[in-house]
Structure formats: structure tokens, C-alpha cells
Amino acid sequence: MSKLMVFTGNANPELARRVVRRLGLPIGNATVGKFSDSEITVEINENVRGKDVFIIQSTCAPSNDNLMELIVMADALRRASATRVTAVIPYFGYARQDRRVRSARVPITAKVVADMISAVGINRVLTVDLHADQIQGFFDIPVDNVYATPLLLDDLQRQGHENITVVSPDVGGVVRARAFAKLLDDADLAIIDKRRPRANEAQIMHLIGDVEGKTCVLVDDMCDTGGTLCAAAKALKEHGAAKVLAYCTHPVLSGKAIENIKNSVLDELVVTDTIPLTQEALNCPQIRQLSMSDIMAEAVRRVCNEESISAMFGA
């Protein structure tokens, strides 16, 4: 741990401060800004020669600026002779562009970003709840994907809810929801089959499972515009659910997400701090945020000490 140093860009400095506080370290001294023409500029203001350096930087909105900050800072650290550079990317942007759909003339941007990260000399990536596990295969360097499930599960159990049914908001999330339900003493599982007529729009088609009188817990990796969760909450209430909660790792909350949530029948949306909340989101009474800092700090410590990450999750 004596060689460990942690730096951050402008994407999520508060999470970085929480992580270093738990590690008992100061945040690395770096200047990250822009030139007058909006190009990213980075200067490392202390000695990093021979150090094991971690950069905490989500690639959330503004995605391009935050990605370039990560890339440029990694280059600066390598040129300053850091022994190892690990990119800690709590929210990995561009992850939803992970395959070619509808047309052959589209990029696989998740692969492009993975190549950029590898090419700049980053040695390892540490991220949280990747949108698709197969993205790890896009990298030619080790990728550790840690999970927010222990944090979300602990919070749900502390709330003392009874008669819980875990709900997957779409067919693609069934594996995640089933795993969550299993950890809740094999809670009941329901599935919403939806069709998406166009990007960021969801239409409820069919509910599989009994939710009458239940506390329904929607589980997903992210909340973007909130359309899927709000439509799911409406369908669940129409089928007799007593209460509808949503637990999502990444609060993307783009577009009219806050307005959608405020106008929905969703009782509560619980998210983590992989992405900082806007003031509008902080003021929304239905949104509550938990911190991933304990899990992230332990993951950083384990990587630094060459210990198992999977052991954190009982594997």
C-alpha cells in the first residue's frame, strides 16, 4: 500500500474523495482542465515514479470530455514513470453500443473505447456492473467487474419490507433479477416483457408472475430516461402491487428522467454514486442515493495487494 496513489478527473471527484478517505490516503495532486479551445489539459503535480496509480473517473456525461480526461491523465502518468496505472471506471460509458444491430453500418463503440484505454498504456480496468459482461472480452488487459448488489441488497433488507417480489423490467435482465431474488431468501420473481418501438421508449406488453398485494422491487443496472422503470411501475400497480421500488446501480438520468419519475407511480428509486446526481435529481423526493465508496476502496486495496476481487462476492 506504500506505493498506492489515487487520482481523479472531473467526472466524479466526490466519490474519489470518499474512496481515498476510506483508504487513509490523500487525493493525488493533478490539474485537470481545458485550454481556451476546449482541448483537455492535464498536469501531474507530484512525483509518481514507481507508484501503483489508480485513476477514478466515470465516463458519464459529458461522456467525451470525461473519457478524454481519463485517456490524457493515463498518458501523463505513464510518461511520469508510474509503474502501473489502473483505470477505475465506476460507470463505463458507451457500454450499450456493444454489438451491431439493425444495420451493418454502425460502430461497436464499446470495443473502440476498450482499444483506446488499452492503447494509452493503462494496465488494468476496474469497473462496476458493466451493462454487458462480454465487454470484458473487448479488452486486451485485465478487467475486474465489481458488483453493487451487496450494497443494494443490504439497503433493501434494512428497510424492513415484507412480501417482496423481485421484478425484471425486461427479458434481458432476468439473470440479474433472479440472482437478486435468490439472495433475498429466494424471493418471488416476476418478469415484464416489453417491446421498445424506438430508442429510449418502452411499451409494456405482458407481466409474467403474481404481484397482487406485493412489494415489487425492480432491479436494473441503470436508469436512463426512466421510461422503462416508470412504465413498469405503472403496469405493476395496475396488476395490484402494493408498492413499487426500483434499485439501479447507475443513475444516468438523461433527458426528462426526473420529470418522468416525479410524474410516475414509482414509490422510490434507489441508486448509487457511480454517477453524481444533478441538483434536480437531489431535489427529487423519490430518489435516494447510496455510496459505492466502501466496495470501491476495498477493490482498490485488493488490486494493489494482488488479492482476489471475486472473493469479495463469495466466489
UniProtKB/Swiss-Prot annotation:
<dbReference type="InterPro" id="IPR000842">
    <property type="entry name" value="PRib_PP_synth_CS"/>
</dbReference>
<feature type="active site">
    <location>
        <position position="194"/>
    </location>
</feature>
<dbReference type="InterPro" id="IPR037515">
    <property type="entry name" value="Rib-P_diPkinase_bac"/>
</dbReference>
<dbReference type="GO" id="GO:0002189">
    <property type="term" value="C:ribose phosphate diphosphokinase complex"/>
</dbReference>
<feature type="binding site">
    <location>
        <position position="170"/>
    </location>
    <ligand>
        <name>Mg(2+) 2</name>
    </ligand>
</feature>
<comment type="subunit">
    <text>Homohexamer.</text>
</comment>
<keyword id="KW-0963">Cytoplasm</keyword>
<feature type="binding site">
    <location>
        <begin position="37"/>
        <end position="39"/>
    </location>
    <ligand>
        <name>ATP</name>
    </ligand>
</feature>
<keyword id="KW-0808">Transferase</keyword>
<dbReference type="InterPro" id="IPR029057">
    <property type="entry name" value="PRTase-like"/>
</dbReference>
<dbReference type="GO" id="GO:0000287">
    <property type="term" value="F:magnesium ion binding"/>
</dbReference>
<dbReference type="Pfam" id="PF14572">
    <property type="entry name" value="Pribosyl_synth"/>
</dbReference>
<dbReference type="InterPro" id="IPR005946">
    <property type="entry name" value="Rib-P_diPkinase"/>
</dbReference>
<feature type="binding site">
    <location>
        <position position="131"/>
    </location>
    <ligand>
        <name>Mg(2+) 1</name>
    </ligand>
</feature>
<protein>
    <recommendedName>
        <fullName>Ribose-phosphate pyrophosphokinase</fullName>
        <ecNumber>2.7.6.1</ecNumber>
    </recommendedName>
</protein>
<keyword id="KW-0547">Nucleotide-binding</keyword>
<dbReference type="Pfam" id="PF13793">
    <property type="entry name" value="Pribosyltran_N"/>
</dbReference>
<feature type="binding site">
    <location>
        <position position="220"/>
    </location>
    <ligand>
        <name>D-ribose 5-phosphate</name>
    </ligand>
</feature>
<keyword id="KW-0460">Magnesium</keyword>
<dbReference type="InterPro" id="IPR029099">
    <property type="entry name" value="Pribosyltran_N"/>
</dbReference>
<feature type="binding site">
    <location>
        <position position="196"/>
    </location>
    <ligand>
        <name>D-ribose 5-phosphate</name>
    </ligand>
</feature>
<feature type="binding site">
    <location>
        <begin position="224"/>
        <end position="228"/>
    </location>
    <ligand>
        <name>D-ribose 5-phosphate</name>
    </ligand>
</feature>
<keyword id="KW-0418">Kinase</keyword>
<comment type="pathway">
    <text>Metabolic intermediate biosynthesis; 5-phospho-alpha-D-ribose 1-diphosphate biosynthesis; 5-phospho-alpha-D-ribose 1-diphosphate from D-ribose 5-phosphate (route I): step 1/1.</text>
</comment>
<dbReference type="GO" id="GO:0005737">
    <property type="term" value="C:cytoplasm"/>
</dbReference>
<dbReference type="GO" id="GO:0004749">
    <property type="term" value="F:ribose phosphate diphosphokinase activity"/>
</dbReference>
<dbReference type="InterPro" id="IPR000836">
    <property type="entry name" value="PRibTrfase_dom"/>
</dbReference>
<dbReference type="GO" id="GO:0005524">
    <property type="term" value="F:ATP binding"/>
</dbReference>
<comment type="similarity">
    <text>Belongs to the ribose-phosphate pyrophosphokinase family. Class I subfamily.</text>
</comment>
<feature type="binding site">
    <location>
        <begin position="96"/>
        <end position="97"/>
    </location>
    <ligand>
        <name>ATP</name>
    </ligand>
</feature>
<keyword id="KW-0067">ATP-binding</keyword>
<keyword id="KW-0545">Nucleotide biosynthesis</keyword>
<dbReference type="GO" id="GO:0006015">
    <property type="term" value="P:5-phosphoribose 1-diphosphate biosynthetic process"/>
</dbReference>
<comment type="function">
    <text>Involved in the biosynthesis of the central metabolite phospho-alpha-D-ribosyl-1-pyrophosphate (PRPP) via the transfer of pyrophosphoryl group from ATP to 1-hydroxyl of ribose-5-phosphate (Rib-5-P).</text>
</comment>
<dbReference type="GO" id="GO:0006164">
    <property type="term" value="P:purine nucleotide biosynthetic process"/>
</dbReference>
<dbReference type="GO" id="GO:0009156">
    <property type="term" value="P:ribonucleoside monophosphate biosynthetic process"/>
</dbReference>
<dbReference type="GO" id="GO:0016301">
    <property type="term" value="F:kinase activity"/>
</dbReference>
<keyword id="KW-0479">Metal-binding</keyword>
